[in-house]
Amino acid sequence: MPICSVHPLAYHADPTGYFSLVRHAPGAVLLDSGRPEADRGRFDILSAWPLEILAPVADETGTAFLQRLRDSLARLGDAQLPEHSPLPFAGGLIGYLAYDFGRMLEPLPAQAVDDLHLPSARLGLYGWAMVSDHQARSSQLVFHPALADDERQRLIGLFEQSLPTADDASFHLSAPFATDIDAEHYRQAIERIHAYIQAGDCYQVNFAQRFRAQYSGDPWAAYQALRVACPTPFAGYLSLADNDAILSLSPERFVKVSQRQVETRPIKGTRPRGNTPAEDAAYAEELLASEKDRAENLMIVDLLRNDLGRTCRTGSVRVPQLFGLESYPNVHHLVSVVTGELPAAKDALDLLGGSFPGGSITGAPKIRSMQIIDELEPSRRSLYCGSLLYLDVRGEMDSSIAIRSLLAQDGQISCWGGGGIVADSQWEAEYQETFTKVRVLMQTLEAL
């Protein structure tokens, strides 16, 4: 088996300095664990100059596109990291699946307007990466054996130079964020969801609204401000064409595969952070004790057990954590963990095909909930509730749910906030929660 070469670099907890060296390059991508402010994530991965870019073509099925991804990894070729290396990436795919990639996997109506025209998936095939391991306090370049030696030497020279001490990038909104739907429209949508629940169509539907603003400047400057204001373990920045970008500050894992072991960490249940320690603790205790939030979370856990069971070895799906508390700068969340094991005949792409999009951001049952979302949300979700991910040539994968995420495109920046609607949901509280989840993002950018 060919072995990747690893070149040590000076360790930096903050990945933005290293990323600044490549951020203008084609296909520049950063998967960011939010250090040094966040403390849950272990690795940062960044790369650029992909060997190829893969995106769906007209009338291609989701299964066919996933097979093209599988074929691209095979073209790059099998490789292993040096013995005992814990690094997560040995060369392979990095990119995103938009929520609307789900349309390529399941039959859905086409009622919501596709006004952002973002491709439903875009992944680069990368022969190298700069990986920081915050547990070992190390940074290193990882080179797939197929990468040409002169390219390795060029990258070593690039990353061994002094990092820039300042970035002159700036970002400015021309007006505050505005929502696409007003409170009355939101109330009517929740009434419609309640009618579907009472009719037996569904138990829970994730309903979201979009916020938009015009901007000038560089989205990278916006991301740098956001990662300080809202550090999260599944953040990321993806450069797109024409200085457009994806900016993600997600707290939520979708699915991880490591040595054929599968983990998903659904979030369902939210409270704001308090202004005082006592108020903050009260919100956390209220969330942990909330029968409504626990019921919502359990519905999604059951859905994800089913989704993982479509691909994982029979009898391997477990729930090692139910209703755990995770706290972030803006919110407390209720988080559960579902695990499983891939059988020899299945891989991470089979798992994606059987479980995308995530159950925590659709509802239960999933397909009917997605049909209702398409009926009631006026525009397609685009990036929102899709996934940022890597998948390497060994089959190792990690992926996020693209919540708390923004799309900067054609001088307009969009973000979304949503929540799970169940039979006893009060529309006013749910409406306010959509603002709570993204307020820190919007206020941070409005202050620039």
Residue spans of the language-model regions?
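Extended alpha-helical targeting/anchoring segments
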Residues: M1-L448
